[in-house]
C-alpha cells in the first residue's frame, strides 16, 4: 500500500523512537496532536487529519493511555531511508 510523503516522514520518525501525544478537551474529543522525536524535540507537520489517516491505516496505536507509537504494520509500511546522523 502506498502512503503519502508526509505519512512516510512521520512513520520514519516514529520508527526511530518518536511518539505522538494528544490533548483532549472537556468532552474527551481530541483537540491537538503533537509529534516528538526520540530526543524530545517537537516536530511540526502533524495535524489532526494526518493523525487520523495514520490511525485508520493501523500504523500507530496507543496502549494503556501512553503516547501513540508505531505498530508492526506501520514498520512494514515505511520504506527504508538512510539515517542522516
From Swiss-Prot:
InterPro entries: YjhX_toxin. It holds the Pfam family YjhX_toxin. It comes from the Bacteria. Belongs to the UPF0386 family. This is UPF0386 protein RL2079. It comes from Rhizobium johnstonii (strain DSM 114642 / LMG 32736 / 3841) (Rhizobium leguminosarum bv. viciae).
Amino acid at each position: 500500500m502506498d502512503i503519502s510523503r508526509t505519512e512516510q516522514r512521520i512513520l520514519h520518525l516514529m520508527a526511530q523512537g518518536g511518539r505522538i501525544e494528544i490533548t483532549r478537551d472537556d468532552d474527551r474529543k481530541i483537540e491537538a496532536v503533537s509529534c516528538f522525536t526520540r530526543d524530545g524535540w517537537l516536530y511540526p507537520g502533524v495535524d489532526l487529519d494526518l493523525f487520523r489517516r495514520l490511525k485508520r491505516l493501523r500504523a500507530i496505536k496507543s496502549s494503556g493511555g501512553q503516547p501513540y507509537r508505531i505498530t508492526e504494520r506501520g514498520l512494514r509500511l515505511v520504506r527504508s531511508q538512510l539515517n542522516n546522523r
